[in-house]
Curated annotation (Swiss-Prot):
High-level lineage: Bacteria, Pseudomonadati, Pseudomonadota, Betaproteobacteria, Nitrosomonadales
Name of this protein: Enolase
Residues annotated as binding Mg(2+): D242, E285, D312
Biological process per Gene Ontology, one example term: glycolytic process
Function: Catalyzes the reversible conversion of 2-phosphoglycerate (2-PG) into phosphoenolpyruvate (PEP). It is essential for the degradation of carbohydrates via glycolysis.
Species per Swiss-Prot/TrEMBL record: Nitrosomonas europaea (strain ATCC 19718 / CIP 103999 / KCTC 2705 / NBRC 14298)
First-listed, main subcellular location of the protein, grouped into a coarse class: cytoplasm
Length: 428
């Protein structure tokens, strides 16, 4: 009864108003699995390829009708009749059908939509929530959220070079209190911005997008917001920064335009280390450019024992690249973005490889999101212990937090909140 009898894709709209793909997988029993795919603005050069139409007369070239055609044609014909319970086999079949190294022929967006829809259909057929179907009886850890409070870089129309300034409520007793904490700090920050006559418009990921005179001003104001909201900076609420440094790495230097600086790799390491000394920063993402592996080595040597150093663009959820990074002692954490690699199986493999190497794995959204909540279930299913899914505004971000709250309720007394233990690679 779990045989696939129909696969249908369609073009829908994401949180930035751009087209993306949604797929339905129908089983013989009548059960339906549905999944939609996110899209990034800050994109690593080695990510799996998102297939766009390139027709300037339609959505300015961003349509996904070619990806829809891939699903409704070749992919549908190939997986029709297969057992939805055989996730690994189906994903392997999709990868082989595409035949390219980076899923550029059929499109990683087309392949991923089907891969996730298959998993959802199989979970429904099994009578299990998705997190339990994927993770089994040990899926009980609720991840620590990394909550985006200030947007910059390519995620906002402001002067900030850094892409994200986040709070991390690691000292709270459970997820529900962590979410409350995030909402209260977010509200307090809005009040502080209003008092300074700064705009409270939000960026792609729901964080505020004011134009500060310097990057560091965002950190100082966030610490003030944490304190005025009634929480302890550091012990209860730490800070994370996504530099997205590949976006401002040019001709061998890191150009921080708002600060008027052009820094070498070593100088940029010093710059970040100064922030770590002044503020309760526990996590830095993409602290070095994806091209600057030597810089990554310097950063890891300097801060790798006390700060979570997250590789996003440098690893792109790819086990081959992650394996090389582990062997060269690059970073100590990986950001997991399901559309960077393009199938559920490969995503789970990357998480497992990271954990086996003592790296943390952070399940992440993209700047262009939908109402799909799959990443919340994946975070719990894999005991990833951390999730990055935006701010406490915009329903595309809140959908994931609300799904985590439902999972916590579903787990009942079995639910455990990771808290500070989520940063197991750091020395106390």
């Amino acid at each position: 009864m779990s045989a696939i009898v129909d696969v249908i894709a369609r073009e829908i709209i994401d949180s930035r108003g751009n087209p993306t793909i949604e797929a339905d997988v129908l089983l013989e029993s009548g059960v339906l699995g549905r999944a939609s795919v996110p899209s990034g603005a800050s994109v690593g050069t080695r990510e799996a390829v998102e297939l766009r139409d390139g027709d300037a007369q339609r959505y300015y070239g961003k349509g996904v009708l070619k990806a829809v055609e891939s699903v409704n044609g070749e992919i549908s014909e190939t997986i029709m009749g297969l057992d939805a319970m055989e996730q690994c086999f189906i994903d392997k079949t999709l990868i082989e059908l595409d035949g390219s190294e980076n899923k550029s022929r059929l499109g990683a967006n087309a392949i991923l939509a089907v891969s996730l829809a298959v998993a959802k259909a199989a979970a429904e057929e099994s009578g299990l929530p998705l997190y339990r179907y994927l993770g089994g009886i040990n899926a009980k850890w609720l991840p620590v959220p990394m909550m985006n409070l200030v947007n910059g870089g390519v995620h906002a129309n402001n002067r900030l070079d850094m892409q994200e300034f986040m709070i991390i409520p690691l000292g709270l007793p459970n997820l529900r209190e962590a979410v409350r904490c995030g909402a209260e700090v977010f509200s307090t920050l809005r009040t502080l911005l209003n008092k300074r006559n700064l705009p409270t418009t939000v960026g792609d990921e729901g964080g505020f997008a004011p134009s500060f005179a310097r990057n560091e001003e965002a950190l100082a104001l966030i610490v003030q917001a944490i304190d005025e909201a009634g929480y302890q900076p550091g012990s209860e609420v730490a800070i994370g920064v996504d530099c997205a440094s590949s976006e401002f790495f040019r001709e061998g230097k890191y150009h921080l335009d708002v600060d008027g600086l052009g820094l070498t790799s070593a100088q940029f390491v010093d710059y970040l280390a100064t922030w770590v000394e002044k503020y309760p920063i526990i996590s830095i993402e993409d602290g070095m450019s994806e091209q600057d592996w030597e810089g990554w080595g310097l950063l890891t040597e300097r801060l790798g024992k006390t700060v979570q150093l997250v590789g996003d663009d440098v690893f792109v959820t790819n086990t081959r690249i992650l394996k090389e990074g582990i062997s060269r002692n690059i970073a100590n954490s990986i950001l997991i973005k399901i559309n960077q690699i393009g199938t559920l199986t490969e995503t789970l493999n990357a998480i497992e490889m990271a954990k086996c190497a003592g790296y943390t794995a952070i399940v992440s959204h993209r700047s262009g999101e939908t109402e799909d909540t799959t990443i919340a279930d994946i975070a719990v299913a894999t005991n990833a212990l951390q999730i990055k899914t935006g701010s406490l505004s915009r329903s595309d971000r809140l959908a994931k937090y609300n799904q985590l709250l439902r999972i916590e309720e579903d787990l009942g007394e079995m639910a455990q909140y990771a808290g500070r233990s989520a940063f197991y690679q750091l020395k106390p």
